[in-house]
Amino acid sequence: MKKLMAANWKMYKTPQEAALTAGELVKAVGTVPDDREVLVFPPFVGLAQVAQAFSGVAGFYCGAQNVYPADEGAYTGEISPGMIVSTGAAWALTGHSERRSVLGESSAFVGQKTAFCLEKGLNVVLCIGETLEEREGGQLEKVLRGQLSEGLSGVPAGIAPERLAIAYEPVWAIGTGKVAGTAEIAATHAVVRGMLRELLPAAADSMRILYGGSVKPDNAAAIISLDNVDGVLVGGASLQAESFSRIILA
């Protein structure tokens, strides 16, 4: 299975800046190693530009940071899977903790998005993760199981495993500079793999589980070498081509 090296650019970069960084990234990486794939989630307004920069370049893909589970309609401010596909993007991100906490998205709604995207031909990275209070309160497995079971509730049992990835992002490690220890990461990813075997047994062992949370060039190699870590989802360190290329090639 290829490691999925993903970047979430959040609400940064104009279309022009996104195109420039995407082009710089292609040059900095050169040929993507056979065991890697690169996936960038720019803001909506930069999707077409990043897709164009990656067009015809093996191993580079882009996706949307959000999606609405309908083909079209009176949903002001929202974007449909078809609109995303029309830009040249192939992926969508669902369940990110910032959308759960800041915008109040429930796990049930995340599940609707995930299932609808897969039905409409978009691949999905589904994010899960606990707060520090939940971890310290012994709620880690309960929280992750709830997010996974609802997030995957509409996913068909026969889903092709390469079309769906899980990103485990401990909320307390996102943008804080705090990183879960390698033992913590490995243990939690093993728990997630076990849950996937219960929920999607046919696909579970071939699905990629990414780690996210203050991933940087100097810790990426140690993280992606762990059992059940099949890539990373990178925030701040992905905004510059130089640093993200080092993570991709770590």
Curated annotation (Swiss-Prot):
Record's keyword terms, sorted: Cytoplasm, Gluconeogenesis, Glycolysis, Isomerase
A Gene Ontology biological process term: glyceraldehyde-3-phosphate biosynthetic process
EC number(s) per entry: 5.3.1.1
Transmembrane segments: none
Top EC group: isomerase
InterPro entries xrefs: Aldolase_TIM, TIM_sf, TrioseP_Isoase_bac/euk, Triosephosphate_isomerase, Triosephosphate_isomerase_AS
Subcellular location: Cytoplasm
Catalytic activity of the protein: D-glyceraldehyde 3-phosphate = dihydroxyacetone phosphate
Active site: H96, E169
GO molecular function: triose-phosphate isomerase activity
Biological function: Involved in the gluconeogenesis. Catalyzes stereospecifically the conversion of dihydroxyacetone phosphate (DHAP) to D-glyceraldehyde-3-phosphate (G3P).
Recorded family membership: Belongs to the triosephosphate isomerase family.
Oligomer and partners: Homodimer.
Protein name: Triosephosphate isomerase
Gene that this sequence comes from: tpiA
